[in-house]
């Protein structure tokens, strides 16, 4: 969680710029004595940040300095509603090990961060539909995803009907790993989404990488729980984001 001094720094350097930006991409700082309505908006954003940090920390204490944020956050980031993230990694589990966990959508609520409920229905030869509730009290979002399966190499989830975002795409693909180590594979993880609200986008942008890493790690930890220790240490091959 954020320490008091860090939260004050966020109020001045991050929270106010998030609330109002110029169309040209330059941030307009507010008067040191903001109006009551702006105080309310900032307070809501602080609560959202606290909730995000609480979920991202996984129960461990984390502290963030204002200099860290200044190094990685630009005013253009605050204007983005569309984000994407890709990561290719060599892991010490077989394609089937990874596929069996990622395709187990009905149990996402047991091990995937932010997923509170996951129900599968409308099964077909190429996949199924899944109703999910994600979020953290008191904020929750319900949506339906179309999940496409190509065992044991692909799990693709798409949603275009969410109230929180315009679309959400999540794709996992698996390819053979090292020839001399059968229990290894190369996983390619991709996530792309666009929020309807610029305010939600701004909050997510601050912790975008952290959230993506935490979600990916949740699947790896679940594979470890089911299949045991990995055959080799994982190695990140490529990683990129918008």
Curated annotation (Swiss-Prot):
A GO term for molecular function: ubiquinone binding
Keywords annotated in UniProt: Membrane, Mitochondrion, Mitochondrion inner membrane, Transit peptide
Gene Ontology biological-process annotations: cellular respiration
Membrane topology of the entry: Peripheral membrane protein
Species of the source: Drosophila melanogaster (Fruit fly)
Protein task: Required for the function of coenzyme Q in the respiratory chain. May serve as a chaperone or may be involved in the transport of Q6 from its site of synthesis to the catalytic sites of the respiratory complexes.
GO cellular component: mitochondrial inner membrane; mitochondrion
CDD domains in alphabetical order: COQ10p_like
Protein name, as recorded: Coenzyme Q-binding protein COQ10, mitochondrial
Subcellular location: Mitochondrion inner membrane
Top-level taxon of the source organism: Eukaryota
Family: Belongs to the COQ10 family.
Gene: Coq10
Assembly mode: Interacts with coenzyme Q.
Record bears the keyword tRNA processing: no
